[in-house]
């Protein structure tokens, strides 16, 4: 039987980031063979990672990447904010989103899932890909991405269509694109515009508001007006184009869009946006 020295365990630990006890166990099982011990650690880790899947993973971070063809956001969860700052966790997340964007895929491959399991085994936390958003970029479209804070707990992607694409170099346009991404991060709209809201959802909200006013004693015509007003206000809260702009609450996002379009002499449209948040 091979004698496993503390130096051997230390070396394996430095190379794999696995725990001291696990390294010692793996080296013993591998009779001191380092490569076999690494394989043992991966096997042990993947088995234990499966057991951790039912543990809460309420922390994590959002990763992003963009090229001239695609852009995307990736939300990877973990159990602690300490791990969310771990360089191995961050490096893997950045690598995954880059590979996804460059391939145009919106799902991880088997090898990428194995990488995640291996990392979960090393760090000993439940690590999972929760959300992936990949979008194609057309020749007249501009993408702005914003990640909030050191831990990137909020990620925003906004895609704009610009008639005269040369105007995307304009400082006013650049500032607006950044402000728009900040706006989405701050107000978390659900829909782009009122036309995108599901009719059944609006009907359900109308019924809720009507129920709240059921015993108000007001006439039916007045109640209809009140409900309509409440619906309008509610839609303005959840639809990006109807929200008050983050840098000027006297105008809506729609109005600001028209103002900037006029200022740079090129029509700007919001094609789509995505908001991802940890927790």
Curated annotation (Swiss-Prot):
Bridged cysteine pairs (disulfide): none
Chain positions covered by the region annotation Involved in Mg(2+) ion dislocation from EF-Tu: 80-83
Alphabetic keyword roster: Cytoplasm, Elongation factor, Protein biosynthesis
Residue ranges crossing the lipid bilayer per the database entry: none
MF GO annotations: translation elongation factor activity
Location of this chain's protein in the cell: Cytoplasm
PANTHER family with a match to the protein in the record: ELONGATION FACTOR TS (PTHR11741), ELONGATION FACTOR TS, MITOCHONDRIAL (PTHR11741:SF0)
Family under the similarity heading: Belongs to the EF-Ts family.
Its job: Associates with the EF-Tu.GDP complex and induces the exchange of GDP to GTP. It remains bound to the aminoacyl-tRNA.EF-Tu.GTP complex up to the GTP hydrolysis stage on the ribosome.
Name this polypeptide is given: Elongation factor Ts
Protein species of origin: Borrelia garinii subsp. bavariensis (strain ATCC BAA-2496 / DSM 23469 / PBi)
